[in-house]
Amino acid sequence: MPVQRSSRRSSASKNGTTKRSKASPKSRAKSPTRTSSHSSTTFPTKMKRILTFLLKTCLGLIALFLVISLLAVFAYKWVPVYYTPLMVIRQVQGVEARGGGWQHRWVPLDSISPYLPVAAIAAEDQNFLKHNGFDYRAILDAYEEAQEGGRVRGASTISQQTAKNVFLWPHSSWVRKGFEAYFTVLIEWMWSKQRIMEVYLNSIEMGPGVYGAEAVAQEYFGCSARGLSRSQCALIVATLPNPLEYSSKHPSRYMRKRQRWIEVQMRAIPFLPKEEKTSQKP
C-alpha cells in the first residue's frame, strides 16, 4: 500500500511538471507582445526628447546671437571699426590696393571734409536725416519701377549700407536682407546720425583695397580727408555704386557726368549738423 501511494505521488508530480512545462510555452509566447508594446511606447518618448533638445539648442543659439549682436552694436557706438567682413573677403579674393593689402585709416567725423557727408546724402540717401533707417517711399518707387519693366535699382539707405558693411557679408539674399534690417534697427536705436555717417565714411569701399575717406584722399588725391574739396567729394561718392569698376583717380566721362549731377543735388542738402545740437540716443 505505501508503495502505491508513492507511485501516485510520483505520477501526480509528473503530471504537475508536465502541466507546468506545457504552460511555459504560452508564457514565452506572450513575452514578445509585451516587448513590442514597450518599444512602441519608448519611440515617441525618444523623439520627444530629441525634439526638445533641438528646440532648446535653437533657442539658445538665438539668444546667444541676440546678446552678441547687441553688445557689438553698443560697443561700436564708441569703438572705431578697423575691420569689416568685406575687407577680409576682398583680401581672400586678391583685391588689393597699390602696394598690396588694403588701405584703411580711421579718422573722426570732424577730420573729414564737411562736403563728403553732404555728397553722400545727395547721391545715396537724401532723406537720411529724416527717416528711421528705412526710406519707405524710395522702396515703393523702386518696386513700382521694377514692376513696370524699368531697371532694378537699389533703395538702401545709408543706415542700411552701414549695417551691411560693418556686420554682414556683401552678397545679396533674403537671409542677409533680414539680418540687414535687424542691424539697421539696432544702429538707428543706439547710434546718432552723426555716428552712422562717421562709421559709413570710414568703412565703405572706395576703390580696390581702399576703404574710408582718409585712405581714398591720401591714395588718390594726395591730401587728408579734411582737405578734400567739394568737387573731389562729389567725384568720390560718384564711384560708390561700384568702386571696383569706377575710379575717382581716373574718372570716365560717365563719372564726370555723375559728379556734376551730385554737385547740383548738393545745393539742396544742408551740412550735417553737429552731434551736440541733436538729441542724444541711448
Show which residues each predicted segment covers.
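Juxtamembrane regions of bacterial inner-membrane/periplasmic proteins
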Residues: 2-282
